[in-house]
Amino acid sequence: VLTIEHAPAQAIPAKEDGFVVAALSLTPSAWDKESNFQKLASYARQAAARGAQVIVAPEGYLEGYVGNEHRTPGLTREKYAREAAEPLDGEMLRRVSALADELDVYLMLGFAEKRAGQVFNTAVMFAPDGSAALHYAKSHTMNDEPFNTKGDAFPVARTPFGTWGTLICFDRQVPEAARILAVKGADTLFVPAWGGYGEMNDQMMRVRAYENGVNVAFVHPKRALLIDASGTILARSQGDGDQIVMGRMRVDPKRKHSMLKYRRPALYRELTQDAVTAP
């Protein structure tokens, strides 16, 4: 396990088991997609040169997370869609795809996605060949994201390193979201985020890993955590400056099986009944 702050100087030795994840804890510039892409490319190249096979950037990284009304007071739907959002097949995302291809890595970042006349808070994972291996729209949003349409699916990606799923920021606070990904076979969850972080979040991420028997990579501009399926923190950021946090994750099928085999789904039907409301 290796935590690298600011300027990485050491590689993680290559091994045959598991895979090396680099969490890019970077603060992007609001509205400056070109600058943010250049920073992403610089840090991704450093991480890849030191053995990273999977590289992940935070929520809303490309446009600088401007879709939150606390970060951008007075934002209008029209300005957000016109100046912040990008289509998945647009020029900016093609450049990110090409970067994954160039570095021969899996590369994930968050961005405001323009799709079917709407904008989604999206995370996309490009595979080493540049294809989109995992494409997810944030499904749980609070009232501070008035212009983002909620996603309605929990996709998983089957890769040579295991089965992966993703949650975005507030999704992680909804236990059912992580659980459905685990039930669908995910053994590693990537969680690009922006909002809250700190000790309470660290504990919550450890619980999500433990209760589902999955690895978790939490990636925030001010915090990064790599956690194994037992809830142990493998690596974490130091301070709140731009940095790369690297560690090796391994998949233990026995761990996930032990967490899920005692479930009794028939007892949980009330969770999906519209008539059931919170007090």
Please report, for each region that a protein language model flagged, where it lies by residue:
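Beta-strand-turn-beta hairpins that frame and shape the catalytic cleft
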Residues: 12-21, 156-165, 188
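Cys-nucleophile CN-hydrolase/nitrilase-fold catalytic domain and related Cys-dependent amidase chemistry
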Residues: 33, 42-128, 179, 198-210
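Conserved beta-strand and immediately adjacent loop positions that scaffold enzyme active sites
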Residues: 20, 108, 122, 153, ...
